[in-house]
Amino acid sequence: MSFDLIIKNGTVILENEARVIDIAVQGGKIAAIGENLEEAKNVLDATGLIVSPGMVDAHTHISEPGRTHWEGYETGTRAAAKGGITTMIEMPLNQLPATVDRETIELKFDAAKGKLTIDAAQLGGLVSYNLDRLHELDEVGVVGFKCFVATCGDRGIDNDFRDVNDWQFYKGAQKLGEMDQTVLVHCENALICDELGEEAKREGRVTAHDYVASRPVFTEVEAIRRVLYLAKAAGCRLHVCHISSPEGVEEVTRARQEGQDVTCESCPHYFVLDTDQFEEIGTLAKCSPPIRDQENQKGMWEKLFNGEIDCLVSDHSPCPPEMKAGNIMQAWGGIAGLQNCMDVMFDEAVQKRGMSLPMFGKLMATNAADIFGLKHKGRIAPGKDADLVFIQPDSSYVLKNEDLEYRHKVSPYVGRTIGARITKTILRGDVIYDIEHGFPVPPKGQFILKHQQ
């Protein structure tokens, strides 16, 4: 049999091992994995490279439509491809209108036409004003529902995203449980964080350390405990977003050990940046929950290696530069990190700390695909989509602004020496990014709907 493509001589990350083996691709799918595969229209030599499943980034903000001047599908998904991401799961905010019903999700689909360099799945929003319309999003095919128990949204904009109170969360989770959906939650105590932040501003405490102190670990832990209990009472699967503290992870682990259906994610910035670096970098490293101190970071690495964190995500949430102006307490909170999840974490986790390649593959791709029901994604195995990434290990470069594909070429990682490089990204059998030739094919990404899985 002649295949469309054979990838030869790479160290391939399989689910439970990594070894030098060939991959054959036919019709956009992985057709065979074995030694000495022959006869293909095209052959790629991956000698000396790691061949990983394409990253499934389960937490991405592309602010189109309505705030395309923050980030758009064209720039955002090009950055994703350059960073080794082949599937993103997009959040129902920061776009306007927020994605909270059938009409608003159709606006998203229309806005993305012809612009997706990678594949995308969509989350719906659970907000204070759409409890009677959640079913519309489920029927369209979202793979989960995001909500905030921290304060969220611009109160001056009618169709912006909104946080939920405990009653709204409980009722929404009940409905989502009946739909066999997952609720994803941003967990920080709204009132305490808001009041601590206002208090700091009044007293002129506006440094990075002051911002971190205004969103202490206990505000994350309390919110995680609360939503765990309410989701359990409501009968709904729970996914805790961007955990920043080992104490927060421990709450999820405890609930899981007691039999609750709960998963969690974290982000590269909580593992590679600390509060002192945040102070040096400035507002580009502001996010919530905040980047914490070195002792906290050490605990997060332990939780990651223990297998207590299910997946790593970018939480890519950029904005125009003017929204990062001023002091840290005033600036927009969000990090542009989409393009540098895989290379940074390969360097820090695999090369510097000895993480196994199969564990890396699970954290970057497999587990997220499983959590959100993306049955064709996340694994290098026969029958799966041929979504693959070539990583060149032990290949250092210094990230520059001009390397970035974002609408606004800024990132807290600019100036960082990264010890690995993404050299090629393949989506359903086609090379969509190559380090030497850029983006060789027109955008071919498509939306993945739950009911099509």
Swiss-Prot record:
Keywords noted in UniProt: Hydrolase, Metal-binding, Purine metabolism, Zinc
Q: Which Pfam families match?
A: Amidohydro_1
Q: Which cofactor does it need?
A: Zn(2+)
Q: Which residues bind Zn(2+) 2?
A: K146, H186, H242
Entry's InterPro entries? Allantoinase, Allantoinase_bact, Amidohydro-rel, DHOase/Allantoinase_Hydrolase, Metal-dep_hydrolase_composite, Metal_Hydrolase
Entry similarity comment: Belongs to the metallo-dependent hydrolases superfamily. Allantoinase family.
Its biological purpose is as follows:
Catalyzes the conversion of allantoin (5-ureidohydantoin) to allantoic acid by hydrolytic cleavage of the five-member hydantoin ring.
Outline the subunit composition. Answer: Homotetramer.
User: What's the protein here called?
Assistant: Allantoinase
* Gene source species: Salmonella choleraesuis (strain SC-B67)
Lineage of this protein's species?
Bacteria, Pseudomonadati, Pseudomonadota, Gammaproteobacteria, Enterobacterales
